[in-house]
């Protein structure tokens, strides 16, 4: 369903991601795990046709991200790290607007809006102004706009960032429900976030893939290995590079 081959993106001399290759099958819920600045959002933006890559290829359902972006936008829904909300709009009106942007036929707009309001538990706030909602509800509105056109694939970039513990639990539950009918890519820098929602994990560090495997297999591998924590006071980047060249060192972060 999603095929990524040797994907790279540079900002001037800095490489944000380098030679990423992975596949995601239909119906999978895949976690994209890595620290802040690892390249997760850059990858999500490329998959969502928002940002061009420097090199490599991406195909989604057979469509080329760089040459057939309009076709891909019909089958994906994207929630960026900062939800694209208009704080002065009423929830219902905003979702109707989002439906028009996604070319939902006018005759189907009302039913599409009502469906996402139901799925995202927004009924009690549907007539309220977005800017006056809690962060948890605003995140629900962000997810609702991502799925307003009933896409096959949902790409969620840090969907619980900045939420309180109760709101995090509620959003996790919502994503788990959506996973029953969508292919989902979820990025996060929080390990429990990934372990509670995803079946397979792609670990990214410094713009490169460190591991791709099922959650169970990765857990087994981590249990077998040893982890060493070092406090580096100077020339940290140089030391990190040298550590990566050592035999039997799987990852350095």
Please report, for each region that a protein language model flagged, where it lies by residue:
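Short acidic-hydrophobic catalytic motif
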Residues: 216-221
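Residue-level recognition of short, structured coil/turn motifs
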Residues: 103, 135, 223-224, 248
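Generic recognition of short, well-ordered alpha-helical interface segments
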Residues: 196, 210-213, 234, 238-241
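Short, charged/small-residue-rich alpha-helical element at the C-terminal edge
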Residues: 224-253
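ABC transporter nucleotide-binding domains
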Residues: 2-4, 9-205, 210-211
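Generic secondary-structure microfeatures
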Residues: 198, 205, 222, 232-234
